[in-house]
Amino acid sequence: MPRLSWCAALAAMALAAPAGAVLAQSAAPDAKPYQVEWVYRVKYGYQEEFWRIFQKYQIATLDRARELGYVASYTVVRPGLHTSEDSRWDYRIVVTFTSQASASHRGEVERALFPDKATRQREENRRWELTLNHWDLPIREIDPHADPE
């Protein structure tokens, strides 16, 4: 009997180790936050359709990534006034990941949330059809009183 208990304890530790390692990686004390700004310009007249799809997949993925500790926070903004077409944007999302490494988990989180790959791809392809321009830009805050870098 004692040998069986020892084996069961060893098996339990082996199964728990990967989960603990993942938590330790996402909460590393020396990891610095990593910010990325996603900017989207959408075809005129299609902002609502774009946003519904974006909410379904991207916002849900960001919410789950925040629950898992990969995302510290995110902010979504829209412009308050119209601009010229060459500088127009419709949505800016600033995502603060807990570290640069944590930014790489978006795909796995999305696949876990939305296992129907065909539907996800079809709907996300539609969102990209509605997107005229897009970029992801790593950004960083600076001290306005510090010397230039």
Outline where the language-model segments fall:
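Bacterial N-terminal signal peptides that target proteins for export
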Residues: 1-11
